[in-house]
């Protein structure tokens, strides 16, 4: 398995590669959100049903505008999300019509986060777009907390391990429905 720095992954991801990378709290699995083949590979590796949907992480909100239908959110709803970003808050927002079902699952919305983690931000900046994000584990198992765990669990199944350090969080992000304001998962 390749071991790369964030600045070295652009071509691999844009050509359909699936990567493992450190996030705020655990290692994540990621790929290009515009490549259905890569998303299907990620879902197969994780053994996750497509119907559940996935998260997009970004370095700034402008990377998410091709996926999120802002016209369905009020200025106040958007401002609330912006007040929490970058940070450990994931917002469920309405999708634009062209967004892949493999990303949003059986929903008319998608979970999005503007990350405060330097490594995640560097990945998204290198790509020039958001990154699909899901915890690096098989469905129902604990997420990986080290590069060694990634190598043991995913050798031969993913294309690269991105080098870097986990963030300081020990809990997953809080998930909030942007339309209703309802907290769907309490996190950090």
From Swiss-Prot:
Question: In its UniProt entry, what is this protein called?
Answer: Threonylcarbamoyl-AMP synthase
Function of this protein? Required for the formation of a threonylcarbamoyl group on adenosine at position 37 (t(6)A37) in tRNAs that read codons beginning with adenine. Catalyzes the conversion of L-threonine, HCO(3)(-)/CO(2) and ATP to give threonylcarbamoyl-AMP (TC-AMP) as the acyladenylate intermediate, with the release of diphosphate.
Q: Which species?
A: Shewanella sp. (strain ANA-3)
Q: Per its UniProt record, what HAMAP family does this chain match? A: TsaC
- Which reaction is this enzyme known to catalyze? L-threonine + hydrogencarbonate + ATP = L-threonylcarbamoyladenylate + diphosphate + H2O
The record's gene field reads tsaC
Q: What is its main location?
A: cytoplasm
Gene Ontology MF terms: ATP binding; double-stranded RNA binding; L-threonylcarbamoyladenylate synthase; tRNA binding
Disulfide pattern: none
List keywords of the entry alphabetically: ATP-binding, Cytoplasm, Nucleotide-binding, Nucleotidyltransferase, Transferase, tRNA processing
Q: Which PROSITE patterns match?
A: YRDC (PS51163)
Question: Residues in domain YrdC-like?
Answer: 3-188
The record's annotation in Pfam families points to: Sua5_yciO_yrdC
Q: Record's InterPro entries?
A: DHBP_synth_RibB-like_a/b_dom (IPR017945), Sua5-like_dom (IPR006070), TC-AMP_synthase (IPR023535), TC-AMP_synthase_SUA5 (IPR050156)
The Swiss-Prot or TrEMBL record describes its family as follows: Belongs to the SUA5 family. TsaC subfamily.
Q: Where in the cell is it found?
A: Cytoplasm
Q: One GO CC term of this entry?
A: cytoplasm
**SUPFAM superfamilies per the record?**
YrdC/RibB
Q: Which GO terms describe its biological process?
A: regulation of translational fidelity; tRNA threonylcarbamoyladenosine modification
Give the Enzyme Commission number: 2.7.7.87
């Amino acid at each position: 398995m390749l071991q790369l720095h964030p600045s070295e992954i652009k071509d691999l991801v844009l050509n359909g590669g699936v990567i493992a990378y450190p996030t705020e709290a655990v290692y994540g699995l990621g790929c290009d959100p515009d490549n259905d083949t890569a998303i299907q590979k990620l879902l197969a590796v994780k053994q996750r049903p497509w119907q559940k949907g996935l998260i997009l992480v970004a370095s700034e909100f402008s990377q998410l505008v091709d996926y999120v239908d802002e016209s369905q959110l009020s200025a106040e709803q958007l401002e609330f999300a912006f007040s929490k970003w970058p940070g450990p808050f994931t917002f469920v927002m309405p999708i634009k019509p062209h967004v892949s079902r493999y990303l949003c699952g059986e929903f008319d919305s998608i979970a999005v986060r503007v990350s405060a983690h330097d490594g995640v931000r560097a990945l998204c900046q290198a790509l020039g777009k958001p990154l699909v994000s899901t915890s690096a584990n098989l469905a129902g198992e604990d997420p990986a907390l080290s590069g060694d765990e990634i190598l043991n669990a995913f050798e031969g199944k993913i294309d690269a391990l991105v080098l870097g350090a986990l963030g300081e969080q020990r809990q997953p992000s809080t998930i909030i429905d942007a339309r209703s304001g309802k907290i769907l998962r309490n996190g950090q």
